[in-house]
Regions:
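Short, basic/aromatic recognition patches
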Residues: 1-18, 166-197
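A short, Trp-centered hydrophobic/proline-enriched beta-strand micro-motif
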Residues: 11-23, 67-71, 194-201, 239-241
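GNAT/GCN5-related N-acetyltransferase fold signature
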Residues: 19, 33-35
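A short mixed-secondary-structure module that forms the rim of ligand-binding clefts
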Residues: 36-77, 213-249
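Charged, gly/pro-rich active-site loop segments
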Residues: 78-185, 225-317
């Protein structure tokens, strides 16, 4: 599958995109990743890198490789286009590249988006695992959906297989569908970040990710709205990501939620989202602090990955 030049510009430009992957129960988790422009139009693939230490993410992708990447944020990037571009597909490869490829290909690409690596005796030791312990994930693109506005407004253009109707049919969780986290607290936290995204599984099994605004919070959950009628009628598991990031990702805020979305059949642009779990990460706006924390996290998670034997999740190079 091949996409046009204007979409390719967006795929090359964004510093941070939202990765949506499925949970075993049929929900969606959304997290930020840096694609560093990895793509191949001739092969119809888009890629991103992550850490071997993030084994839970890799395990879930291995179990169900249907994913989506939402190119939704232009700040600090290389394009001023207003398009919201959603790439949907199936992970075809999870590979730990050799050191030469990491240095020559991934390293050079990373510098364009994330800046030159810190050098010196301390930094070489502290960031050794962070720079070496990278996993390359390749997604075979099945569909691209492009909206003309970053808020998801306007008539969508679909490249590839047609969009299915509705979401994946699901049974409600045994613990009930109502909020398990105080809704007003979630509203306040999500109100501190500029980007808010909602993800759910479509009827064809691929995650859909849409931009949302939050207009209210009460005992039922968060009232979420989209710029167009894209929400599936009924109830299903869904994930929310609220985030912001600074230039070269020298600091970020991430608010992740999983929960239950309920949508009335009469209004496909409004839903009630009941948050069930949350995960918050704040890294101050400082390149030095960000690298210190990244180095610590990479070393810690890599040791955990070795202990858990997560190398089995990787393809052979």
């Amino acid at each position: 599958m091949r996409w046009p030049d204007d979409i390719d510009e967006v795929l090359d430009a964004d510093v941070v995109v939202a990765l949506a992957y499925r949970t075993p129960a049929g929900g969606v988790v959304i997290s930020g990743v840096s694609p560093i422009g990895l793509r191949d139009r001739d092969a119809g693939t888009v890629g991103f890198t992550t850490s071997l230490g993030f084994g839970r993410k890799l395990e879930r992708i291995r179990r169900n490789p249907q994913v989506a990447l939402a190119f939704h944020a232009r700040e600090h990037g290389r394009s001023r286009r207003a398009d919201y571009v959603l790439v949907q597909g199936t992970v075809s490869e999870v590979l730990r590249p050799g050191e030469a490829y990491l240095r020559q290909e991934i390293g050079k690409r990373s510098e364009r988006y994330l800046g030159a690596p810190r050098r010196g005796l301390f930094w070489d030791r502290w960031l050794r695992v962070y720079y070496r312990d990278r996993v390359l994930v390749t997604v075979q693109v099945e569909r691209i959906v492009r909206w003309p506005r970053l808020d998801g407004g306007g008539e969508p253009e679909v490249i590839g297989s047609p969009l299915p109707e509705g979401g994946l049919r699901q049974s409600p969780p045994k613990q009930g569908t109502g909020p398990r986290i105080e809704s007003r607290r979630a509203e306040r936290r999500l109100g501190t970040v500029p980007h808010r995204l909602l993800g759910f599984v479509q009827a064809d099994g691929l995650p859909m990710v849409v931009a949302i605004t939050i207009t209210a919070a009460d005992g039922r959950g968060l009232t979420v709205r989209t710029a167009g009628p894209v929400l599936p009628a009924g109830g299903l598991r869904a994930g929310v990501l609220g985030h912001k990031f600074y230039e070269q990702v020298a600091g970020l805020t991430s608010r992740q939620y999983t929960g239950w979305l309920t949508v009335d059949a009469e209004d496909a642009s409004t839903g009630i989202y009941a948050p069930h779990t949350e995960r918050n990460l704040v890294i101050p706006h400082s390149k030095t602090i960000a690298l210190l924390l990244n180095g610590l996290a990479a070393t810690t998670t890599y040791r955990a990955a070795q202990k858990a034997g997560r190398e089995r999740l990787l393809d052979r190079s």
